[in-house]
Amino acid sequence: MKNKLCLLLILSSFVLNIHAQKSIRIGIIGLDTSHSVAFTDLINGDKDNAFAKGFRIVAAYPYGSKTIESSAKRIPGYIKKVEQQGVEIVSSISELLDKVDCV
């Protein structure tokens, strides 16, 4: 019973923290496909988009797959595109997790 109560308190705290924020901060792992740019445009691009209201992509770790040459070549271009939408590029997944609420 004590464990359940502790879990309930922790989850309640998490939910209240998210509701207190202006928006839920989203992170992306991997800027090696066009999907990452498309999702960033959808969520960050149109302020009046009801689908994305309350959400914002704020950070991205660019490397999904460094070993697939065709994917790795696209990363620099996709970095520029998401930076134009206000996304911060981070150097590690650990750093990304410190900046976001969900990935």
Regions found by a protein language model. Give the residues of each.
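N-terminal glycine-/serine-/threonine-rich beta1-alpha1-beta2 phosphate-ribose binding loop
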Residues: 20-103
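Bacterial Sec-dependent N-terminal signal peptides
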Residues: 1-22
